[in-house]
């Protein structure tokens, strides 16, 4: 991250404290590894944001219902950062700058609400784009394609990468989302671990007017008439096997959820900030019986479940994965209507779960621990 590097180069001993908030934001939002100097910058930057030195960031936290003492690197990367980024994607980045330069609470709150509204618009556009991508896959019979090339001319080019990432997560295939720009077609790609996207693009570079990227992500410009030839060429040269399309997750240890108590959650807190390069520990347990649940969020994209452990305890699990895929899996494994039964509080469905442990505040109540599931079986897990 250039911001963090510049701070360290300019003044290695006496870093300007008033810039730490922005260095922390930049480091996390630029997906830098939270190690060494980066870790220190983010940790100290979080402290300053919590103290409310910057009126704009304080207001942005308030409109997003983030309590200062609960602020973490997660909020920088997935709540505050997207709000600041949305205005650059859909309007002008000057509005984010105006927020950060606000001197009065009134000005800051006005700007923060506007940015939050823009981010909600960005989220809605993203959901619509994902739905349209699903329809495109069905309409163009792409279920057998190893590399998915999806043309959505009506999608705003600034959110093509976000949509590509979401579609990649859902199907676990390399994905290109293409949109219609002023000077031809533009697009973003997101890949899986087994597919080097930039190298694959280099093999068919004659179809691009411009391209760049790395193993897991890329950007491109091309002619509209070359979309189908590109799709055919990428799939013809692709050497991925069926095993490559099976999601895999590496856990730290298999551990009963009952072991996750206040003390353990407190010890994990000492390891923060978590993020790229310093991930939150992952655990797994088999035989968790899902009894009841309900969907949450403006777009109902996550859910809370009550589960019973093999040891006889009851735990709360918050699921941030693909609810549609989870519902289909339940209906296939336990019979049609199983998903409906679970949300009606009549579930009795054993599942294996990969989870994380952390504290969570919900409706003013702090719960310890809350276990966040990433994937439900069938999933390949390794320690």
Model regions and ranges:
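Short, small-residue-biased leader/transition segments that mark boundaries at the very start
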Residues: 1-9, 376-380
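Mid-to-C-terminal polyanion-binding domains and interfaces
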Residues: 105-113, 117-151, 203-375
């Amino acid at each position: 991250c250039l911001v963090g590097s510049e701070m360290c180069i300019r003044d290695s001993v006496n870093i300007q404290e008033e810039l730490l908030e922005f260095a922390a934001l930049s480091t996390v939002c630029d997906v830098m590894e939270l190690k060494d100097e980066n870790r220190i910058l983010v940790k100290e930057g979080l402290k300053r944001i919590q103290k409310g030195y910057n009126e704009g960031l304080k207001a942005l936290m308030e409109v997003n219902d983030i309590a200062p003492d609960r602020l973490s690197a997660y909020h920088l990367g997935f709540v505050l950062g997207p709000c600041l980024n949305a205005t650059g994607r859909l309007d002008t980045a000057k509005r984010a700058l105006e927020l950060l330069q606000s001197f009065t609470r009134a000005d800051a709150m006005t700007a923060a609400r506007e940015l939050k509204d823009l981010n909600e618009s960005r989220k809605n556009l993203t959901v619509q784009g994902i739905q349209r991508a699903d329809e495109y896959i069905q309409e163009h019979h792409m279920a057998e394609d190893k590399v998915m090339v999806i043309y959505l001319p009506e999608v705003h080019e600034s959110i093509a990468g976000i949509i590509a990432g979401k579609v990649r997560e859902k199907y676990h295939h390399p994905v290109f989302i293409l949109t219609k720009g002023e000077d031809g077609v533009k697009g973003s790609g997101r890949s899986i671990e087994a597919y080097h996207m930039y190298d694959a693009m280099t093999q068919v570079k004659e179809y691009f007017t411009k391209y760049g990227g790395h193993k897991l992500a890329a950007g491109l410009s091309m002619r509209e008439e070359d979309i189908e030839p590109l799709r055919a060429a990428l799939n013809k040269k692709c050497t991925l096997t069926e095993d490559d399309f099976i999601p895999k997750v590496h856990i730290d240890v298999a551990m009963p959820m009952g072991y996750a108590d206040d003390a353990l959650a407190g010890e994990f807190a000492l390891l923060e900030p978590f993020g790229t390069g310093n991930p939150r520990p992952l655990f797994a347990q088999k035989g968790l019986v899902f009894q009841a649940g309900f969907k949450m969020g403006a777009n109902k994209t996550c859910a809370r479940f009550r589960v019973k452990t093999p040891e006889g305890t009851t735990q709360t699990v918050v699921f941030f994965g693909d609810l549609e895929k989870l519902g289909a899996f339940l209906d296939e494994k336990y019979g049609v209507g199983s998903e409906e039964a679970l949300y009606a509080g009549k579930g009795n469905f054993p599942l294996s779960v990969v989870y994380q442990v952390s504290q969570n505040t919900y409706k003013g109540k702090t719960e310890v621990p809350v276990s966040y599931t990433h994937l439900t079986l069938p999933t390949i897990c390794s320690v």
